[in-house]
Amino acid sequence: MHPLRCVLQVQRLSAPFTSMCWVLLRTCRAQSSVSSTPCPSPEAKSSEAQKDFSSRLATGPTFQHFLRSASVPQEKPSSPEVEDPPPYLSGDELLGRQRKVYLETYGCQMNVNDTEIAWSILQKSGYLRTSNLQEADVILLVTCSIREKAEQTIWNRLHQLKVLKTKRPRSRVPLRIGILGCMAERLKGEILNREKMVDLLAGPDAYRDLPRLLAVVESGQQAANVLLSLDETYADIMPVQTSPSATSAFVSIMRGCDNMCSYCIVPFTRGRERSRPVASILDEVRKLSEQGLKEVTLLGQNVNSFRDNSEVQFNNAGSANLSRGFTTNYKPKQGGLRFSHLLDQVSRIDPEMRIRFTSPHPKDFPDEVLQLIRERHNICKQIHLPAQSGSSRVLDAMRRGYSREAYVALVHHVRETIPGVSLSSDFITGFCGETEDDHRQTVSLLREVQYNTGFLFAYSMRQKTRAYHRLKDDVPEEVKLRRLEELITVFREEASKANKTSVGCSQLVLVEGFSKRSTTDLCGRNDANLKVIFPDAEVEDITNPGLKVRAQPGDYVLVKITSASSQTLKGHILCRTTMKDSLTYCTT
């Protein structure tokens, strides 16, 4: 008997509740001498399949069905779902068993916030936190990749920790070292291959996975999760406030960035933009208010492009308005609750809580945002406008979406709309192809705008960026450093002039504590986010005439400014007050 010969025929079908799928149909042909039921012909099978498809299509959901489903708000679970542990790990293995974790943070304020998110997750799994490196069982470094210098700092730190790990007494549990954040995302392969003493890698979107990763590490393996997410915002995780005397807090409202500036690694290490639901942000701010905190900073890589699309009824709204003369590198986004709505709602929670936000993009300052900042007394009159360069040619190479002229026009518009506003900015010197004339234009922008605060850096090329693939890092390092020094000098001169306009004025200051340089001076920050130093003294409480008090962290006080530098104001305290009452007395 000849063996059976099988022929596989692939036919594409459609099921009513799924997308198109591939189905394998087995048809068999046997030798005519073999006694078997004959298979239908291909034509018959095709006709039968078409009839079956038509029947299922007629009884399946219609377009109206999907419209009705979309218009009905989905019931939200009372608590976030907790995924079952992988089958090879028991629930007990995911517990920290009171092992001590030491967390070390590098880079931006988002990393500081991420550190508290990671700690909140580990705390719930039974880990303890320690500030003593020597007693730690797990050391986690929350890292930054924005510049080469930041990464080199981490490599140097790992060499130091390697000594600590090799000298670990055998009587103690093995020391585990993990790299978290942007550097884990950018250099995952190099870290695991170059530094065998690193046990764990977790990218910015993988902190929920830390208990599992640590459990895998305990089995003697390296563990890594650096997957980027399109929707992870950690909205359900309340960061742990580790300082009991803290007067302010940062609230992350969105993650990632879609701007794709040619020099920037952020979209590749933190992924696409996604925003937290407004309701979860408001809930976190309310809790911080109840804890007595007096200042909240809304945080995001591109904070003012916030767009909450979680509520269906707001998804059909039009696209956002951009600052005049500004463009985007992406298609305009439609719908959602925008930053102006969030800022409005947050500022209404507690009239005695100051509201800030960082870091914005200049393109996302429509008039409704500026008007709101002007009208609300508890939204700080301080705006960060990252320029990056004063040369339109360089700005075009950076893919910033604006010219020098458009940027300067925005500065004038902001100052006209918000009298007395304080401005800060970011600048990069030595970008690809930057000439001496380009550099002089940046110097002239610093003099023209006269920022109160500035953050200036020499360009550091990052792999994966558009500049890495399409431009040449052709400005010598010594030239970059020389230009940076020139920018810093000019910035300090102009900032000192700008800040000296406050001398003689009375300003509202939120007390943070004693000055680091003197136990007799107090330190706080004004509306412009400038540090204000003033002698500790007994003063009157304006809300309770006749009562003499000494200012404490978290108090609002009026301070008369007597001197100013490029970074600090000095003065003497007048009284303790509230935000509302201070409106009568502040002269700036």
Swiss-Prot record:
**EC code:** 2.8.4.3
* Compartment(s) where it occurs, according to its Swiss-Prot or TrEMBL record: Mitochondrion
Q: Which organism does this sequence originate in?
A: Mus musculus
Q: Which UniProt keywords apply?
A: 4Fe-4S, Iron, Iron-sulfur, Metal-binding, Mitochondrion, S-adenosyl-L-methionine, Transferase, Transit peptide, tRNA processing
Which InterPro entries does this UniProt record tie to the protein?
Answer: Elp3/MiaA/NifB-like_rSAM, Methylthiotransferase, Methylthiotransferase_CS, Methylthiotransferase_N, Methylthiotransferase_N_sf, MiaB_methiolase, rSAM, rSAM_horseshoe
**Which sequence ranges form a coiled-coil region, renumbered to this chain?**
none
Q: Where is the Radical SAM core domain?
A: 243-498
**Subunit structure comment from the entry:** Interacts with CDK5R1 (p35 form). CDK5RAP1, CDK5RAP2 and CDK5RAP3 show competitive binding to CDK5R1. Probably forms a complex with CDK5R1 and CDK5.
Looking at the record's lineage, which domain of life comes first?
Eukaryota
Please tell me whether the keyword Iron is annotated for this protein. Answer: yes
Q: Where does [4Fe-4S] cluster 2 bind?
A: 257, 261, 264
Q: What is this protein called?
A: Mitochondrial tRNA methylthiotransferase CDK5RAP1
Required cofactor names = [4Fe-4S] cluster
- How does gene deletion manifest? Knockout mice show a deficiency in ms(2)i(6)A modification, resulting in impaired mitochondrial protein synthesis, which leads to respiratory defects.
Alphabetically, the GO molecular function entries are: 4 iron, 4 sulfur cluster binding; metal ion binding; N6-isopentenyladenosine methylthiotransferase activity
**Transmembrane stretches, start-end:** none
